[in-house]
Amino acid sequence: MKFTLIGNGRMGQQVAHIINNSSAHSIAAILDVDATITPEVFHGSDAIIDFTVRHAFLENLPAMVASGVPIVVGTTGWDDVQADVRQQIAAANTSLLYSANFSLGVNIFMRIVREAARMIEPFSHFDIALTEQHHTGKADFPSGTALRTAQMVLAANSRKTSIVRELADGNKLTPNELHVASLRLGTIFGKHSAFIDSETDDIEISHTAKSRSGFAAGAVEAAAWLALRHTTAPGFYTMDDFLDEKLGK
């Protein structure tokens, strides 16, 4: 398959490296984040892979949608306009797959945490909290992956109804609040953890990224999946949909 890449930063370069070393895929074009995008630039591509920034993604979205080529988006920070993006995708009868993290390992981690949160729900003496660690260059916190994991915990455990990102001096957590703590240090690629605690024992579930290659490989695999899915069932997808199909659910 042929992919057009938008964004030539660290993730974009890693995606290009994965594709260039693949016998099954090739690069149709690599577009810089500041490039002028028209629908025509995507002709001949089986899918678009976007790793840019919020403003660039939203500015380029109309051209991507108009091209009719399925879109894979790793750009984060646009959850507040996701309803509008979904509407654009539906109106054009095209396809978009979005994930804050394409690593297969971290998506498996999130499912394990969701199941753990569900299992402790009947036992009030168990509590749960999340942490995420990244390099100092990462601007957003908590990470999109941590927030997605937190949302999955809230959906699985009715005892948790809201997310707390920071604690002000003197404030205490209430039992219904899920604490999501962030750390920025050095060159950490990314570590996400769930801590489950009780008076008698504790459980820790963690995922540690060793490099960006896992994120990039997952994005390429998701793009190939979406390109095939688009022909029969266009729509807005996430890595949950990708994994559900792979797992036969």
Swiss-Prot record:
Underlying gene: dapB
InterPro entries to which the protein is assigned, alphabetical: DapB_C, DapB_N, DHDPR_bac, NAD(P)-bd_dom_sf
NCBIfam families: dapB (TIGR00036)
Chief location category: cytoplasm
GO cellular component: cytosol
Function: Catalyzes the conversion of 4-hydroxy-tetrahydrodipicolinate (HTPA) to tetrahydrodipicolinate.
Matching CDD domains: DHDPR_N
The organism's place on the tree of life at top rank: Bacteria
Native organism taxonomy: Bacteria, Pseudomonadati, Chlorobiota, Chlorobiia, Chlorobiales
UniProt keyword annotations, A-Z: Amino-acid biosynthesis, Cytoplasm, Diaminopimelate biosynthesis, Lysine biosynthesis, NAD, NADP, Oxidoreductase
Organism: Chlorobium chlorochromatii (strain CaD3)
Active site per database record: H134, K138
Keyword Phosphoprotein: no
Annotated EC: 1.17.1.8
A single GO BP: lysine biosynthetic process via diaminopimelate
HAMAP family according to UniProt: DapB
Subcellular location: Cytoplasm
Protein name as catalogued: 4-hydroxy-tetrahydrodipicolinate reductase
Pathway as given in its UniProt record: Amino-acid biosynthesis; L-lysine biosynthesis via DAP pathway; (S)-tetrahydrodipicolinate from L-aspartate: step 4/4
UniProt family annotation: Belongs to the DapB family.
Annotated residues for binding of (S)-2,3,4,5-tetrahydrodipicolinate: H135, G144, T145
